[in-house]
């Protein structure tokens, strides 16, 4: 027979206490360590939000286009700072088509018998692909096409703050150093036990890799035929040198 207090607890509608999970927010989402990088942690301002810090450092915290507008900050002289539009943001098809649509005249070629439209004749700079009006220079409607054109025209020479430029350059140098370290990583050498195991396999089966893969005694871990080929090729290269 259970205790009366325990029965009351079971019938109570009060939420039961759950053990606190480390690295998890109250909303249940995983807590992200934004200060994992030493350069970002050194230049992080705890008085600002994550978005404000990323904008100040010259980084982007979200690749999607903003859905609710952008924050307008007041400068020292009292004017409102205008945030430039990011050319890498991919806009929705409805918004893009509404902005690109313009009033104009076109010529239509019809079938003399049925009266159906055969061909729509536009200006030289525009064509119709799949019922959509596209530029000849960008028939796939690639949003990065305009960016490449702007870069060739000198968009890379836009002025940026020295602190932002320095931080981004430090991060790029760090990423380049880590990439070089991965490339220059020393290859794994086979141990003596592995070389002895490969020698026994070759002595018994020769070049028959399928028989090696099926051998339960010499190949208890059931290494695949392709894996055995790579190991034996590496063993031969080390012994031929």
Curated annotation (Swiss-Prot):
- Mention one GO biological process in which this protein takes part, according to its record: rRNA processing
Q: What is the annotated localization of this protein? A: Nucleus, Nucleolus
Annotated region (Disordered), positions in chain: 1-29, 92-111, 132-196, 208-241
Gene Ontology CC terms, in alphabetical order: nucleolus; preribosome, large subunit precursor
Record keyword rRNA processing present: yes
Q: Which UniProt keywords apply?
A: Nucleus, Ribonucleoprotein, Ribosome biogenesis, rRNA processing
Provide ranges: composition bias, Basic and acidic residues: 208-218
Chief localization = nucleus
Q: Which InterPro entries match?
A: Ribosome_biogenesis_Nop16 (IPR019002)
Q: Which intervals carry biased composition (Polar residues)? A: 154-172
Matching Pfam families: Nop16
Enumerate composition-biased segments (Basic residues). Answer: 230-241
Renumbered to this chain, the Low complexity biased-composition regions fall at 137-146
The organism's place on the tree of life at top rank = Eukaryota
User: Could you confirm whether the keyword Nucleotide-binding appears in this record?
Assistant: no
Instruction: State its role.
Output: Involved in the biogenesis of the 60S ribosomal subunit.
Q: Its quaternary structure? A: Component of the pre-66S ribosomal particle.
| Annotated family | Belongs to the NOP16 family.
This one is known as Nucleolar protein 16
Q: What is the native source organism of this protein?
A: Aspergillus clavatus (strain ATCC 1007 / CBS 513.65 / DSM 816 / NCTC 3887 / NRRL 1 / QM 1276 / 107)
């Amino acid at each position: 027979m259970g205790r009366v207090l325990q029965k009351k607890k079971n019938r109570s509608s009060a939420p039961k206490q759950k053990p606190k999970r480390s690295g998890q927010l109250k909303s249940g989402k995983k807590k992200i360590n934004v200060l994992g990088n030493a350069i970002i942690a050194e230049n992080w301002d705890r008085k600002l939000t994550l978005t404000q810090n990323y904008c100040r450092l010259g980084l982007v915290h979200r690749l999607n286009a903003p859905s609710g507008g952008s924050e307008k900050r007041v400068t020292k002289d009292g004017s409102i700072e205008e945030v430039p539009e990011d050319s890498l943001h991919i806009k929705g098809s409805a918004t893009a088509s509404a902005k690109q649509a313009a009033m104009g005249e076109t010529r239509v070629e019809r079938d003399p018998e049925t009266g159906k439209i055969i061909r729509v004749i536009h200006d030289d700079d525009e064509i119709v692909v799949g019922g959509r009006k596209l530029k000849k220079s960008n028939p796939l409607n690639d949003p990065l096409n305009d960016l490449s054109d702007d870069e060739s025209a000198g968009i890379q020479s836009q002025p940026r703050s020295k602190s932002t430029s320095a931080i981004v350059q430090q991060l790029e140098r760090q990423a380049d150093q880590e990439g070089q370290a991965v490339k220059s990583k020393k290859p794994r050498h086979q141990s003596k036990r592995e070389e002895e195991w490969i020698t026994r396999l070759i002595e018994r089966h020769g070049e028959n890799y399928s028989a090696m893969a099926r051998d339960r005694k010499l190949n208890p871990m059931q290494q695949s035929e392709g894996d055995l080929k790579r190991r034996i090729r590496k063993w031969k290269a080390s012994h031929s040198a």
